[in-house]
Amino acid sequence: VSRHVPLSILDLVSIPEGATAADGIAASMEAARQADRLGYRRLWYAEHHNTAGLAASASSLLIGRAAAVTERIRVGAGGVMLPNHAPLMVAEQYGTLANMFGDRIDLGLGRAPGTDPMTAQALSRSSADPQSFANDIFDLQGWFGDRGTARSAPIFSAVSAGTNVPIWVLGSTVSGASIAGQLGLPFAVASHFAPEQVMEAIELYREVFNASAPTAQIGEPYVMAGFNVMMMPTEEEARRQWTTVQQMFLDVRRGRRRGLQPPVDPASVADSAFADSMLRFQAVGDPKAVVGTLEDFVGRTDVDELIVATYAYDPADRMKSFELLAENWF
C-alpha cells in the first residue's frame, strides 16, 4: 500500500451561477474552518483575473481572513503570480500576515500571469523570464530574513524582517521545475490542470535540486502535486457532481463567461473527453476508488504531498467531498 501523504486544499473560490462573489467567499471561509478541523495540512488560495466564476483574485486578503477563522492549518498563496506584483509589496503583505498569524503562512510563487494577455498587460509590472523570477525570489528571501533587506538594493522592510515565510515555486512545466530545483525550494506542480509535463517536471526537479544554492530553504527535494478530487458515497453521485467541473473547463475553453453550473446527467456533457484530458489527474468516485487513484499516483511519482482541487455547484457538496476524503485518507 502506498504512503498516505499529507493532503492540502487549493481553493479558487468559485462563484456558482446565480450567486455573488460574497457568497463564494463566505462558503470558502466555511470550508476553511472545516479543513482546519479535519486535519488538512494547508489551504492555499489561487490568483485568477478576468474570470466570471472565480473570486480568488486578491489572495493575501483571503489568506488573512482564512487564517483568522482557523487555528492550526497553514494558509497560503497558491500562488502569487510574480509578474503581476512588485516583490516589495509581496514581502510586506506576507510579512504582515506572518506577524499576525505566526508560522502558518506559505508563499507560493508562479511565473504565469494567471489570466489572458490583455488583462496581463493591465496588471503587468515586469518580465516573467526565469532570471528575473530568481532575482525576485532572492530579494524576497532577503526581506523575509533577519536583516529584512533586499539582496539587490538597500531597501528595508520592517514588517517582513525575521518572518522567514517559506517560499514555494509553482509550475506546470520542466522550466518551472528546473527553477525550483536549482533554487533549492519546494516545488508545487500544477498537475490538476496542466498534465502534459508532470512526470518529466517532477523527475527534472529532483535531478537538478541544489541544497547548497544561496536561496535553498530545504535539504532535499519536496514535491506537492495538484489533483482534482470529487468523492461521494457512490460512483454515480460523484460522476454527476464532476459534470460541474467539466462544464467549467469547457466554458474556459470556449470563452464563455458564467458562474459554476449545476451538475447534469454525465451523458449530456458534450466534449467531456476534452475536459477530462486537461483534467487527467482526477480522482472521481466513491471512497474506495478515489483513495485507490491517489495511492496509485503517489506510488508512481513518490510525491511528498497532494493538494486537492474540488469544485461543486452547492458548497455543501464540496464540503461533503472534503469530509469523506479526510475520513478515508487520514
Whereabouts are the PLM-identified features?
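Active-site mouth loops of central-metabolism enzymes
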Residues: 11-26, 80-88, 161-171, 232, ...
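A conserved active-site cap/scaffold subdomain adjacent to cofactor or substrate pockets
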Residues: 175-196, 201-202
